[in-house]
């Protein structure tokens, strides 16, 4: 979502709009969610309907609501013109049988289909338009939801989506019109600025402005945390970046960064959040830790259906969000505090978290760090105590394999059996254990091949 302050216009995609306001799914670590791979569904529909089915149709519509203009756009998966009817199609693949599809799981896809159907009706001046949502597991397991409405009915449903999104648009408008100008004009929060701090800040500003890197060493007591955050906030207000990530390796330094963010927020109103480790904030960690399925955790069941109200409440009440505020709000709405905190980062200017959220492939922020190339968002990365990064990287990209575990499995092929406690699961396909036991160097060579495919860099064989 982007907000144009001059035109008072919100630019948002259909996918983001519906994901924000009609995502009623549950948290399910088993992967039973809808997946974005739509090629198989498109192939199926093209084979079934031929030229009557058109893939990838771009649509957009601008409406006025609550004093703002909304420009909603997206690419509809397909349009079916058959039997005098025009139908907007939304397709999705699932990781399990379609019999598991519930109304909550389908809500987001239906919302997207309604939005595209309305935009199609407006673009082609249709009195009646239909939508079809197709869920595909395999050729023998396909589920379809299909309905038809008048253009007026579709418009009413579309405007309801916009109205549900208005609180989130207001947050973005506040960021652009209030917080960023205040951040640009941010005054140093202390009476005096030490010369070492001034030099430190100049290096940070230079690195941010020109897109470089700065490795800065300063003695204890210099005020490094504020010296790093203050120029980063100024740069944020000047448009050099969209978000600041403050990476730490210790809880104490994270709390120091949170305290510095509070001082800056007191005058500029910038929003900051501290992300705790999933293991620490899991509400069932004492009973059945991190069993993220609707059956095991009641908070996982329908989590996203309750998240929107919780986000609106906490960002209204807090500028700087700590673990206590997250837990209190999560308890009130019966949602997962960890997933809740991840969603809150999208409404914050400063994200304070462990460096594993960047360097660990299993934990990193996919919503922020998966994109690459031109056009990707610009972020400011601040690493506290950067000398700890080497050991953390070794721990994140490494794995430990105990020879005693291998011997227990005899001469069978090793496949997902080397799972050391507290370490990443190590998978070696078609590595014969007879060679492993009697010639460990063969094992190491096998792991090096596996390493090149899986991007693991360090391996330790413990006898």
Name each model feature, range by range.
Residues 210-231:
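Walker A/P-loop
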Residues 1-81:
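Metal-dependent nuclease catalytic cores that hydrolyze phosphodiester bonds in DNA/RNA
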Residues 175-216:
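Conserved pre-motif I regulatory segment
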Residues 181, 187, 240-351, 355-359:
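A substrate-engagement module of RecA-like helicase motors
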Residues 225-239, 260-263:
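Walker A/P-loop NTP-binding motif
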Residues 61-156:
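Mg2+/Mn2+-dependent nuclease catalytic core
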Residues 333-334, 338-350, 355-425, 430, ...:
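Signature of the SF2 helicase/ATPase Hel1-core->accessory helical subdomain module
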Residues 417, 436-437, 442, 452-458:
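Alpha-helix boundary/capping motif
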């Amino acid at each position: 979502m982007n907000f144009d302050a001059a035109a008072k216009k919100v630019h948002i995609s259909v996918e983001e709009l519906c994901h924000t306001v009609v995502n009623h799914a549950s948290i399910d670590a088993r992967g039973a969610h809808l997946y974005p791979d739509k090629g198989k569904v498109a192939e199926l529909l093209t084979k079934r309907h031929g030229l009557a089915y058109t893939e990838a149709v771009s649509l957009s519509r601008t409406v006025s609501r609550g004093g703002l203009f909304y420009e909603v756009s997206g690419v509809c998966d397909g349009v079916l013109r058959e039997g005098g009817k025009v139908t907007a199609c939304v397709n999705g693949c699932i990781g399990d049988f379609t019999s598991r599809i519930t109304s909550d799981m389908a809500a987001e896809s239906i919302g997207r289909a309604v939005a595209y159907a309305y935009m199609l009706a407006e673009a082609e001046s249709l009195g009646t338009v239909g939508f079809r949502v197709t869920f595909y597991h395999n050729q023998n397991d396909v589920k379809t939801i299909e309905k038809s409405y008048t253009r007026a009915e579709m418009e009413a449903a579309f405007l309801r989506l916009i109205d549900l999104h208005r609180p989130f648009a207001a947050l973005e408008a506040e960021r652009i019109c209030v917080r960023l100008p205040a951040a640009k004009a941010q005054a140093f929060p202390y009476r005096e600025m030490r010369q070492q701090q001034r030099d430190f800040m100049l290096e940070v500003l230079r690195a941010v402005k020109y897109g470089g890197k700065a490795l800065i060493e300063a003695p204890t007591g210099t005020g490094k945390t504020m010296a790093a955050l203050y120029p980063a906030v100024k740069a944020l207000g000047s448009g050099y970046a969209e978000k600041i990530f403050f990476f730490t390796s210790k809880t104490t330094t994270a709390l120091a960064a949170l305290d510095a963010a509070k001082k800056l927020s007191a005058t500029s109103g910038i929003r900051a959040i501290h992300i705790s480790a999933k293991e620490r904030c899991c509400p069932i960690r004492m009973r059945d830790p991190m069993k993220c399925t609707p059956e095991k955790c009641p908070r996982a069941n329908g989590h996203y259906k309750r998240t929107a109200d919780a986000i609106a409440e906490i960002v209204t009440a807090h500028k700087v969000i700590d673990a206590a505020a997250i837990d209190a709000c999560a308890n009130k709405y019966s949602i997962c505090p960890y997933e809740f905190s991840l969603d809150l980062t999208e409404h914050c200017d400063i994200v304070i978290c462990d460096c594993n959220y960047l360097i660990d492939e299993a934990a990193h922020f996919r919503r922020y760090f998966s994109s690459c190339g031109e056009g990707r968002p610009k972020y400011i990365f601040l690493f506290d105590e950067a000398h700890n990064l080497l050991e953390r990287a070794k721990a994140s990209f490494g794995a430990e394999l105990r020879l005693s575990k291998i011997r227990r499995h005899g001469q069978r092929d090793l496949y997902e059996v080397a799972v050391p406690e507290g370490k990443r699961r190590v998978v070696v396909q078609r590595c014969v254990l007879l060679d492993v036991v009697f010639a460990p160097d063969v094992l190491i060579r096998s792991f090096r091949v596996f390493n090149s495919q899986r991007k693991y860099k360090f391996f330790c064989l413990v006898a």
